[in-house]
Amino acid sequence: MIKFLSTFMLLLVTTVVQAERIRDLTSVQGVRQNSLIGYGLVVGLDGTGDQTTQTPFTTQTLNNMLSQLGITVPAGTNMQLKNVAAVMVTASLPPFARQGQTIDVVVSSMGNAKSLRGGTLLMTPLKGVDSQVYALAQGNILVGGAGASAGGSSVQVNQLNGGRITNGAIIERELPSQFGAGNTLNLQLNDEDFAMAQQIADTINRARGYGSATALDSRTIQVNVPSGNSSQVRFLADIQNMQVNVTPQDAKVVINSRTGSVVMNREVTLDSCAVAQGNLSVTVNRQANVSQPDTPFGGGQTVVTPQTQIDLRQSGGSLQSVRSSANLNNVVRALNALGATPMDLMSILQSMQSAGCLRAKLEII
């Protein structure tokens, strides 16, 4: 009896670990964020603003703002401002956002300001792609960096030309929503997978009756829902908390060619192969020699003669055996045994895939 209970608990723990909620694997089509953007001014900087002689748009924007406030700047006035900076303001309008709610905004310097620390963003309209104003942003900027300079030396920690304003924008216009208008909703998988799409559809059909959900493709599951907003909200709340056993992922190796980083998931396996990796280095050294006559009155001329030396070296290249590996730990151990650098490892993995020894998809970003 004790042995049976132990086996049952082990199977139960394994099932719980492998199961995930539908809400963690999918999103509802049409329920999405929308990007907003605006152009504004930051004031109150401690002499770290734009150099107006190099950023004329800052002065032009300030003149326009002052004229709207009833202040006229005489023509030809050369304003030497140090406490003002032109900025771009971005934000995301969440789905179902209502008028009067607040959202966070990101403020980024547009000119040559040294820092936005201590600045205040003046009222800035935030527009969508349809050029309609959806929110108004204003407030004090929080900058996560710090810096100081004196005597030609400077120290800087993190970025000073960008910051955030928490709850810095008020929503003024609501986006029209089609939620609740139809009798079907589409669930979209975060990662395309035919097996997972079918498994989610089967899970919903077992709970809500067959025909309630249909997998349309490797990413989309169409679900029949009752009409009305409140009914659809209750229906989605139920099915999004359903548990689905996660299928094994595709074996994949991701290589970042810019940073040289290599990342692989646990499904990657290796077949037995032999690898030889050699390094070829070419060194070119050029030196200018000056040749002049020994006798001052001999009539000769001073000549500069270049001397070039080329050194070609090839190191490494010994053939090493890589054993077949069935799990990630063995794969890492086998690749580390080659003693290759991350940059060399990228070439080795590409060659392994071409030879059929790397059992994984290779993605280069």
From Swiss-Prot:
InterPro entries attached to this UniProt entry: Flag_FlgI (IPR001782)
GO biological process, one term: bacterial-type flagellum-dependent cell motility
Compartment(s) where it occurs, according to its Swiss-Prot or TrEMBL record: Periplasm; Bacterial flagellum basal body
GO molecular function: structural molecule activity
Main location: periplasm
Coiled-coil segments: none
Cellular component terms (Gene Ontology): bacterial-type flagellum basal body, distal rod, P ring; outer membrane-bounded periplasmic space
Signal peptide: 1-19
Described function: Assembles around the rod to form the L-ring and probably protects the motor/basal body from shearing forces during rotation.
Family: Belongs to the FlgI family.
Protein name: Flagellar P-ring protein
The organism of origin for this protein: Escherichia fergusonii (strain ATCC 35469 / DSM 13698 / CCUG 18766 / IAM 14443 / JCM 21226 / LMG 7866 / NBRC 102419 / NCTC 12128 / CDC 0568-73)
Gene name as annotated: flgI
